[in-house]
Amino acid sequence: MSTKVLLGAVAAVLLSASAQAQLAVEKNLTLAMAQAIANGAMEKCVSMGFKVSVAVIDRAGHPIVTLRGDGAGLHTPEGADRKAFTARTFRAPSAAFLKRMMDDPSAHASEEYTRVLALPGGLPIKVGDDVVGAVGVSGSPGKDDECSQAGIDKVADQLK
């Protein structure tokens, strides 16, 4: 009887180990979606008279698309990337991180992360509650979030 129990226990361990060893399946942005988001954000800002840069990153924080508009400031590509990274990292708009830093002095320690930027313009891109990437816009003071949202809106039907 003890042999049967031992064999049963070994089988249970092996079966549970193989079930846990499956690959994770994650949703991610495609290049086509990232291009549509970046172009949508750029079009919105240009229509308002701004010269901006737009960055779209994937769920792991890797750049997919960066656009530097005609006449955009030299700093704007980096600013757009950092805003997107901030939104992805904290799973919230980069403006929320700015508010958090203003409300909680201990949050300033997060400034040590080289790609974090506490300015509006970065928005997470979500499928339900799952953050699959982020978009950042730099160069349209007070309107960066609006431009980022316009980009996300271009692919909203694909984010369901």
Predicted regions and their residues:
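Internal alpha-helical transmembrane segments of multi-pass membrane proteins, especially GPCRs
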Residues: L7-G8, G121
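Flexible, solvent-exposed loop/hinge segments and secondary-structure transition points
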Residues: A21-K160
